[in-house]
Design a protein with these regions (language model features):
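Extracellular "leader-to-stem" segments immediately downstream of a signal peptide or signal-anchor
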Residues: 2-5, 36-42, 47-448, 622-687
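Right-handed parallel beta-helix
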Residues: 162, 259, 268, 428-439, ...
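Compositionally biased low-complexity segments, especially N-terminal hydrophobic helices
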Residues: 3-4, 29-31
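Gly/Ser/Thr/Ala-enriched C-terminal appendages of enzymes
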Residues: 539-687
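Short, intrinsically disordered terminal tails adjacent to the first/last structured region
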Residues: 1-21
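Glycine-rich beta-solenoid repeat tracts in large extracellular/virion proteins
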Residues: 251-256, 269-297, 335, 422-425, ...
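Extracytoplasmic beta-rich repeat domains
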Residues: 449-455
Length: 687
């Protein structure tokens, strides 16, 4: 721990200064008293130094094979008062890397999330729409022609759902009117798509103040009656299940397309409602209920083209340091003649799957794979599936086989890894703002009791989107609030969750560079906002959730995600993930200046020895304040696992080796926000 932030610093400094001060004034004490005071001051300083050295000696470092002096907390250089040691190390390495050739760049001690958010963190667009005339909504006859309920300013046009039959003042279904308005908007966009010299037309699906029923009793009864008829008409169980899934997927509203916004008059006055729970795709798949609103590219994350091989690296390439890759010689030779070669402007997915034992061991270090004591079989699927690294980028330049990407490759690359790249077709410029989505969850939530408990009221699914946003949105009375998946470069801000406790508040899954700021979960959801499944380089900035809940860390190889200035609790069994999908999070989880508003913990376990669940690989906890958040040691976990026959650690780690990299416990550090500081550093460098 830095001595400038030590809780013992002020007392030891005052003791030594007091002794010296007393000796320099008239009315001075006797020489023997001076010696005793000086000795007390020196002794106090010595104790403080020993405590500080002991703490840092017990602080786990990165893998022995990959650590550098720049990664070690407290390397002896002078610090600014209150400045995080890790932040100072990050600054030094990051700045030095700007002048080094790519092959000589050093690993950063923290993930670089400076480019998270809409257009890499830029301000969200301001939609300037002309006010709707009072008579427009009643002009239903011309609505079918695509004029009423629309206001146009340049390439921006508003499609008012009330002009297509929606009525926010009654309790009848508005589903058909919403679909008609969306179809009219899409037709208008397509009419302007042939002009390559004009920007894409931007549509706004507009909901004036009112309550609009998207899924209610009429929809529930209709789908249920069709499901009963399906069961009676189709005897084959496999075919029956396939038809059931196709039917029930239509329960929610799937609204495709790019360059459009679903917009209300404000979250305090515009409400889209789901008054009945939807039916799950399979009775025993509790997670499978469709979402009320499904926006994006509806081809499950966006249409993906064929994979192309990437030339392997000959040396270790640290994460966040190099923005170029080279296609293999055979990668797209066939595409050169048919115009399908990757080109600037293309959205791409870059992926590696490495099943080599050394890759799995490296991903889990300093821990070992947990195995069944009786069979010796691995508990975690990472050994079977391999280490999976995947993220989304945009190609910004091409020179022969060399592609320059929109941001540095977010994963570390090692010799022997096989990388590949594919063009994607995500939805772009999709926004949701100024609305409340109301579910009708009124039960007493029990985890994994039923499909209704887990997913009966799922409100907003953002799937396969690049450069999108959500702002001024409230989610009320839900089982699942928001899910961002297969996406990149999104900003979610001013999002509030309310109502009775449900299952999951917000999930960022299989996505990168997503920024969620000023998200407030007042619903006491079982899983507070968090990450899952390959998520990387995402940021929760100033997240607030209840003290009786905990963030979601739903496993499947998430890595390098940042919770910046989070306020909320730490509760056992709230991370999520099955046994096979452990660990809950690989390396790179950062809690920066978190405030514990829940129960105090003398020794919080990031690696639980008393359960198959609850495994996080060496997170970083900096500036934790609020109620106590002590960190358990690795020694006790390893000792118990060995005793159970689950692992074979030899030797055991020392008693003071913690389950996290810890800095400044009990005192917040500077910078107050890691994300904002990284953005400032990035901007300074660009200038």
């Amino acid at each position: 721990m830095s001595s400038s932030r030590s809780p013992h610093r002020s007392s030891t400094d005052s003791a030594s200064k007091g002794a010296l001060h007393g000796a320099s004034h008239g009315d001075s004490p006797s020489p023997s008293k001076n010696r005793r005071r000086l000795w007390a001051g020196v002794t106090g300083l010595s104790i403080a130094c020993v405590v500080a050295l002991g703490w840092w000696a017990g602080t786990p470092l990165d893998n022995p094979g990959t650590a550098t002096p720049d990664q070690q907390v407290g390397d002896g250089e002078a610090e600014d008062a209150g400045q995080s040691t890790l932040w100072q190390q990050y600054q030094r390495v990051w700045q030095a890397n700007q002048t080094r050739p790519p092959e000589a760049r050093k690993p950063l001690p923290l993930p670089d999330v400076s480019r998270a958010g809409y257009h890499q963190g830029e301000a969200l667009p301001a939609l300037e729409l002309e006010p709707r005339d009072a008579g427009e909504a009643s002009d239903k006859g011309s609505a079918a022609k695509g004029t009423a309920g629309e206001s146009e300013k340049g390439a921006l046009r508003r499609f008012d759902v009330t002009a297509y039959g929606a009525d926010g003042s009654d309790t009848l279904s508005d589903r058909r009117a919403i679909l008609k308005a969306h179809a009219a908007m899409r037709d208008w966009q397509r009419q302007g798509s042939d002009d390559a010299d004009r920007p894409a037309r931007r549509g706004v699906l507009y909901f004036p103040a009112g309550d609009y029923v998207v899924y209610g009793a009429a929809e529930r009864d209709w789908f249920y009656s069709r499901l009963v008829a399906l069961k009676a008409a189709v005897a084959d169980a496999e075919r029956q299940q396939a038809l059931r899934e196709a039917l029930l997927k239509m329960q929610g509203l799937s609204l495709a397309g790019s360059h459009w916004t679903l917009m209300g008059a404000g979250s305090d006055v515009t409400h889209l409602k789901q008054t009945r729970p939807m039916l799950p795709l399979h009775a025993s798949w509790y997670w499978s209920t469709p979402w009320l609103l499904h926006l994006g590219n509806l081809a499950e994350g966006g249409k993906q083209e064929e994979w192309q091989a990437v030339t392997p690296t000959s040396h270790r390439q640290p994460a966040d340091t190099q923005d170029a890759i080279t296609l293999a010689d055979e990668a797209d030779e066939a595409d050169e003649t048919d115009g399908a070669a990757l080109a600037p402007g293309d959205e791409v997915l870059l992926e590696s799957i490495d099943k080599r034992p050394e890759a799995v061991a490296r991903a889990l270090a300093p821990y070992q794979m947990e195995k069944d004591a009786s069979t010796g079989e691995s508990r975690w699927l990472i050994e079977r599936d391999g280490v999976i690294k995947r993220a989304r980028y945009r190609v910004v330049a091409r020179d022969g086989k060399r592609l320059t990407l929109s941001l540095p490759v977010v994963h570390e690359r090692f010799p022997g890894e096989q990388w590949r790249i594919a063009r994607l077709h995500p939805a772009r410029e999709v926004g949701v703002q100024g609305i409340t989505l109301n579910g009708n969850w009124r039960g007493h939530f029990k985890h994994h009791r039923s499909a209704e408990d887990d997913s009966g009221f799922g409100l907003l699914d953002l799937d396969g989107i690049t450069d999108g946003w959500v702002r001024d949105v409230r989610l009320d009375s839900f089982n699942q609030g928001v899910k961002v998946r297969h996406s990149s470069q999104l900003t979610l801000e001013d999002v509030t969750m309310t109502g009775k406790p449900g299952h999951i508040a917000m999930t960022i899954s299989d996505s990168n560079q997503v920024l969620a700021r000023q998200v407030v979960d007042q619903s006491h959801a079982w899983h507070a906002p968090g990450v899952a499944r390959y998520a990387t380089h995402n940021v929760y900035l100033e997240l607030e959730h209840a003290g009786d809940s905990g963030i979601e860390l739903h496993g499947q190889q998430s890595r390098d995600n940042v919770f910046d200035r989070k306020r909320g609790g730490h509760v056992r069994d709230r991370w999520g993930a099955s046994v096979g999908h452990q660990p809950n999070h690989l390396r790179g989880l950062v809690l920066w200046n978190p405030v514990n508003t829940g129960k105090p913990h003398a020794a919080w376990h990031f690696m639980r020895a008393d359960s198959h669940f609850g495994k996080v690989i060496m997170p970083t906890v900096v500036g934790a304040t609020g109620h106590a958040l002590g960190i358990a040691n690795r020694h006790d976990y390893v000792r118990v696992m060995n005793a159970k026959g689950v692992t074979e650690y030899d030797p055991l780690p020392p008693m003071d080796a913690l389950q996290a990299r810890v800095e400044s416990p009990g005192e917040a550090v500077k910078p107050a926000s890691l994300y904002r500081a990284q953005r400032e550093l990035l901007q300074e460098t660009r200038e």
